[in-house]
Every structure is written in structure tokens, then in C-alpha cells.
């Protein structure tokens, strides 16, 4: 049995002569494959607060989040429903709100494609000074 094993171990292998499957015959311009990034759809938007009280002249920053966090289009559109009461200064996922006069206003945030929105009611109270 040992002799049969030794005989198998001493066999010589001949080189491959069939070059049709070799690297030399590969296509010079292989087809290009591109993978498009997957689009992650927005499923909602959430504002951090839904009711706020501020004084006239006071500034406050409010933020909103696109859901899911990995969504492809993270653009938000901010709207002010009563520009006599507040002024808004949108910047990305935040908006700075300034109280102008006493009253109630609504700030709405909408996703860029318009499918989802959230809102915050802002109550602006007059700024009181101490009487003399």
C-alpha cells in the first residue's frame, strides 16, 4: 500500500496548453457594471415641540427631523401662518422664530415632496416692563 501511495505522489503533471480559458483571451473591454444608490423614501417628519410660548422680541430655535434618519431627501420647507405675530428664519432642519406682537401663530414644516408635515402653535405674549 505504501508503494502505491508513493507511486501516486511521484506523478508529474503536464502544463495546461488550452489557452482558450486563460487570462490572455479575456475581453479587452469588459462590460461596465454600475450600481445605482438605493433611494430611501421619507416616511414622516417630526417637529421637536408642538406648542411654545414666547415674549415679543424673544427668539427661539425650533427643529424638525425627517423620518427615517437615512432618508435620501432631507429637505424641509418651513411656513409661517401669521407673519403679523412672528417672523421665521429657516435654515435646514431648524427655524429661528422671533415674536413680533402678541397673538397666536402656527409654524408648519413640510417635507420637500409635500407628503408629510408637522406643526407648532406659537403663543406670543407681550413683553412686560416694571411700572415706575
Curated annotation (Swiss-Prot):
Task: Specify the BIG2 domain's residue ranges.
Answer: 45-115
Q: Gene3D superfamilies of this UniProt entry?
A: 2.60.40.1080
List the residue ranges forming a coiled coil, or say none: none
Q: Which Pfam families match?
A: Big_2
For this protein, the record's SUPFAM superfamilies field holds: Invasin/intimin cell-adhesion fragments (SSF49373)
Instruction: Please report which protein family the annotation says this sequence is part of.
Output: To B.anthracis BA1245.
Q: What is this protein called?
A: Uncharacterized protein BC_1230
Which organism is the protein's source? Bacillus cereus (strain ATCC 14579 / DSM 31 / CCUG 7414 / JCM 2152 / NBRC 15305 / NCIMB 9373 / NCTC 2599 / NRRL B-3711)
Amino acid at each position: 500500500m505504501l508503494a502505491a501511495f508513493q507511486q501516486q505522489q511521484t506523478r508529474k503533471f503536464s502544463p495546461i496548453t488550452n489557452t482558450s480559458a486563460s487570462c490572455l483571451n479575456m475581453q479587452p473591454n469588459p462590460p461596465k457594471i454600475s450600481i445605482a444608490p438605493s433611494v430611501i423614501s421619507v416616511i414622516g417628519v417630526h417637529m421637536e415641540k408642538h406648542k411654545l410660548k414666547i415674549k415679543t422680541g424673544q427668539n427661539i430655535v425650533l427643529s424638525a427631523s425627517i423620518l427615517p434618519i437615512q432618508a435620501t431627501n432631507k429637505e424641509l420647507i418651513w411656513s409661517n401662518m401669521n407673519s403679523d405675530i412672528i417672523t421665521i428664519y429657516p435654515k435646514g432642519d431648524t427655524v429661528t422664530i422671533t415674536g413680533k406682537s402678541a397673538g397666536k401663530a402656527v409654524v408648519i414644516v413640510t417635507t420637500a415632496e409635500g407628503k408629510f408635515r408637522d406643526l407648532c402653535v406659537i403663543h406670543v405674549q407681550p413683553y412686560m416692563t416694571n411700572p415706575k
